[in-house]
């Protein structure tokens, strides 16, 4: 009788542990996919601004965004591959709508809308990465998230001073 009870307790513990592992994997997958979607959004915005930006400031910012998010996208793709997580290859539908709206603008109207779009994406991105840091999950993903939090905080402070 005691053996049956012990076996049942072991099975229950394994089921609970398995459920916790599945939740962690789902959280990691969600984080990676959201972060990569944002990388693609910033790449697309940067490429558009390189073509349509009217000020040197916007064009330089766009070049920096494309370089940075190309590298971040590759880094995150490597982390995802190591964890067998599929990554999206495009921005979200919402971000594609923002891109399409900006594509219809020109001159200073484009520049101002671009700066606002970047600020909005950075705000979402910062919240995403902070959440991953606080989640205390996979060490590699947490390290990536922490590096993004630091970089975004610095970037947003600089943008606030300059714009």
Language-model features, listed with the residues they occupy:
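His/Met- and acidic-residue-enriched segments that coordinate or traffic transition-metal cofactors
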Residues: 2-10, 17-163
């Amino acid at each position: 009788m005691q053996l049956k009870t012990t076996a049942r307790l072991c099975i229950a513990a394994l089921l609970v542990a398995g459920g916790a592992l599945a939740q962690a994997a789902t959280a990691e997958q969600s984080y990676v996919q959201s972060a990569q979607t944002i990388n693609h959004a910033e790449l697309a915005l940067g490429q558009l601004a390189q073509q349509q930006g009217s000020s040197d400031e916007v064009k330089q910012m766009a070049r920096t965004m494309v370089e940075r998010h190309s590298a971040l996208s590759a880094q995150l793709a490597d982390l995802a591959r190591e964890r067998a997580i599929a990554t999206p290859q495009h921005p979200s539908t919402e971000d594609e709508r923002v891109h399409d709206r900006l594509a219809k603008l020109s001159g200073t109207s484009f520049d101002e809308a671009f700066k606002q779009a970047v600020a909005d994406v950075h705000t979402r991105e910062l919240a995403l990465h902070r959440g991953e840091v606080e989640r205390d999950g996979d060490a590699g993903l947490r390290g990536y998230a922490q590096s993004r939090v630091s970089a975004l905080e610095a970037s947003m402070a600089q943008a606030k001073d300059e714009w």
